[in-house]
Amino acid sequence: IWPRDWSSDVCSSDLIFSLFVERSSGISFLIGACMSSAGCVIGMKSATYANVRTTNKARESLSIGETVKVALCGGSISGLGVQAFGMLGFIGVLLIWNGISPDATGHGLLANLECNPSIMRITTYSLGCSIVAMFNRVAGGNYTKAADISADILAKIRHDMPEDDSRVRNVIADFIGDNVNDIAGNCSDLLESFVATMAASVMIAVTIYNGAPSIGEGTLNATVIFP
């Protein structure tokens, strides 16, 4: 799912969280990174197949409505997949460690920094999604811009060859960069925002419960489940 340099960065961050923050937070961080990466991979593959099917539908039917329908169905795969993977990882983190414990305390394997394990697991899960979004934006943006500029320069040198001519090899690289930046980058950004919103609501619910325990755990669970 990740290139080699991404894997080393993610694994080192995972180890740091487990050693110095909270012993199980590294696992939740890795779950978040895997969920975000899986959503990006499915989004890119579905977009690639949808491009071919949309073009073929337009050639066969010559109907704008039928062509747009195929394009929207292909785009909905990544949109629904982002929400599905975000919820899957979030619910998985809650189920693996038996939900939310507002009054629990924990620490890392080496450091004695006390924290709430439930909150820290949710936070690091969101951070795992965010770090993949950053990698996709940076790598996809650089790749896209390099291919785009090189294709523009070649089109200016060769006046008989337009920028998007299939004979220009940089066009394929430009399309790949657009796929990574526009599909994987947007998918990971959306998933990161979606998960961060849920994590923030959980932290607010735990803070309210710790400030006023009289509201009961039923209200806490309802507040956590609502988002």
State where each predicted segment sits.
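Structural signal for membrane-spanning alpha-helices in multi-pass inner-membrane proteins
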Residues: 17-21, 40, 90-94
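Helix-loop-helix junctions within the multi-pass membrane cores of secondary transporters/permeases
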Residues: 163-227
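Alpha-helical transmembrane segments and their lipid-water interface positions
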Residues: 40-47, 82, 86-90, 140, ...
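Mid-bilayer segments of alpha-helical transmembrane spans in multi-pass integral membrane proteins
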Residues: 33-45, 79-91, 121, 126-138
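Single conserved hydrophobic/aromatic residue that forms the stacking wall/gate
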Residues: 1-10
